[in-house]
Amino acid sequence: MAPVTGPSPLTALGLPPVPAAVLDPYLDAAASCFARHGLRRTRVTDIAEEVGVSRVTVYRQVGTTEDAARLLLARELDRLVSSLLPTLLAADDADGIVAVIASAVDFAVNHPVMRKVLQDETDLVGAFVMNEFGTVLERLLLLAEPVVRRLEEIAGERDIDVPVLAEWVARVVLTMVVAPPAGPPEVFLREVLRPLLAATGAHG
């Protein structure tokens, strides 16, 4: 397999390092195939045909379809975090924080691959949550803590239990991804967070 970029904060999440840009054509092809065929039905030959290379080349560059899925997840998560961090740091009220969380949920549920899985491979979602819930929660916690700390800064509060609140936010986000609310995520989150925002005085 081709080398990946080194060191990345994502390695702390238990994910592979961010894939090198040279792999983008393969990961773009994998994403197209996953969105078209689903995770279970996609084969290395599908990815190879999408890129226009041999199956051997795909194996050499990204490995199996499972490997490609993990690398794609690492890349997409890195892109999500990179895009949200500036918005998070610029947020000056609770509505800004809610918008950051909602953006993460929107990114996940509207991602073509995730949308395909949620529509046609729901059994994979159930199995994934049952088998990997703890691992996924740990990953989300590392992303949720900066959000909660920013909320703490905005509110000027020092009584917020950051680890506990971060876990709560992570659990809410995970639930919203695998079972999206009927309405817009931002509206739902604002209602869910209303008691907390009122208690901290962080509401806009």
Short names for language-model regions:
Residues M1-E50, E66-R70, R75:
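Basic, helix-initiating cap at the start of DNA-binding domains
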Residues V51-V62:
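Short hydrophobic/aromatic patch on the recognition helix
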Residues L71, L85-H111, A166:
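Hydrophobic alpha-helical connector segments
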Residues A74-S82:
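Short, basic, alpha-helical segments at the C-terminal edge of helix-turn-helix-like DNA-binding modules
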Residues V81, K116, G126-G156, P163-E167:
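Amphipathic alpha-helical packing segments from all-alpha helical-bundle domains
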Residues P86, L118-A127:
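Short linear capping/connector segments at secondary-structure termini
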Residues V98, A102, D159-A170, L174:
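Short, well-structured alpha-helical segments
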Residues D106-N110, P146, R150-E153, A166-E186, ...:
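Amphipathic C-terminal alpha-helical segment
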